[in-house]
A protein has these predicted regions:
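N-terminal intrinsically disordered/low-complexity leader segments
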Residues: 1-7, 185-189
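Basic/polar phosphate-binding segments, predominantly the helix-turn-helix DNA-binding elements
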Residues: 2-6, 12, 34-56, 91-94, ...
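An amphipathic alpha-helix adjacent to DNA-recognition modules
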Residues: 10-18, 22, 27-28, 36-39, ...
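Short glycine/proline-centered loop/turn elements that form peptide/ligand docking sites
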Residues: 25-32, 39, 52, 131-138, ...
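Amphipathic alpha-helical packing segments from all-alpha helical-bundle domains
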Residues: 107-132, 137-152, 182
């Protein structure tokens, strides 16, 4: 059971960092500045995190966990990749404001870290049952290709002001991913 005070403090720190990321690059944000924005002292900050980057990683991890949670709910059988990709896209859109603030001045915070590794593992588990090969190295690179492409497309969408509808973007992403996987998909029995 997690102490509610800890949850509130960590949430406050993360929200304060998101607000600061809307103003400047993550590399320019200090612990002191973040603590002041969160209205806590540095000692309290260090009770929860070691660095500003740790907070960024925690934010990304929360977003990816939300994405994966949506995708898991979309397909209880775990074998409908299209549904899972649609729900991943939906979750990204639901986190749009938060992601926009982060991407505004610090686009480099996406595409690396434990959150992306979590997303890669999830995608690998999702596509493994429908693929027609057992080559682990090839699977690793295929997952890297799919996740990197997925992230890049959504980052570009955000950078271009979300001009296309989220539905059109989700359809395009599904088409790209399924096209990339089509050669490897096991025929249905």
């Amino acid at each position: 059971v997690t102490d509610l005070r800890i949850v509130k403090t960590r949430t406050n720190i993360k929200n304060s960092l998101i607000d600061l990321l809307a103003e400047k690059n993550v590399s320019k944000i200090t612990v002191t500045e973040l603590a002041e924005k969160a209205m806590i002292n540095r000692k309290t900050f260090y009770r929860h995190y070691h660095t500003v980057q740790d907070v960024v990683d925690d934010i990304n991890y929360d977003i990816v966990n939300d994405v994966i949670s949506h995708a898991k709910k979309s397909d209880r059988d775990g074998n409908n990749l299209v549904n899972q990709l649609n729900f991943i896209g939906l979750s990204i859109v639901e986190n749009k404001e938060q992601i926009n603030k982060i991407l505004k001045n610090s686009p480099e915070v996406f595409g690396s870290g434990r959150s992306v590794e979590l997303l890669k593992r999830f995608i690998e588990v999702s596509i493994r049952p429908v693929l027609n090969f057992k080559n682990e190295t090839k699977l690793k690179y295929l997952v890297e290709f799919v996740v990197s492409g997925f992230i890049s497309v959504y980052v570009r969408w955000f950078n271009e002001g979300c001009a296309e509808s989220s539905e059109k973007l989700a359809d395009a992403v599904n088409e790209f991913v399924l096209g990339a996987l089509s050669e490897y998909v096991r025929p249905k029995s």
